Amino acid sequence: MQYLVFDPRFGAAGDMILSALLALGADRSAVSRAVSAVSNLTIEETERRGIPALSLKTNTGKAHRTLEDIIQIIDAADASAEAKALAKQVFNRIQKAEETVHQSHHVHFHEVGADDAIADVLGSC
């Protein structure tokens, strides 16, 4: 059995997580199809400090969405039912955290509602 240790204690951007998953063998065409509901995805091979890596570029379009808006985008995505369910769980958890922080049930996603953030979550799921 093989193990993968993911330690985000010092932070990890969504595009970094998705790049790592793609470098580990995630299906590039499936990921591109999934994120196409919200963004175009460009994958480039690069090198960082002498280490081969992948660089992702997505559109950074519209932001300021509600959870319902994001759920509609996820539902329209060309992704597996499992990936859609997991992406919805991620955004539901973010919604609950935002409600707690802002002490309100009327939450709008700002950066997290942007096209690139939704693409990062959908692609990683």
Predicted regions and their residues:
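Conserved phosphate/anionic-ligand binding catalytic regions in large, soluble enzymes, centered on
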Residues: 6-19, 109-125
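Glycine-rich nucleotide/cofactor/substrate-binding loop typically near the N-terminus or early
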Residues: 23-102
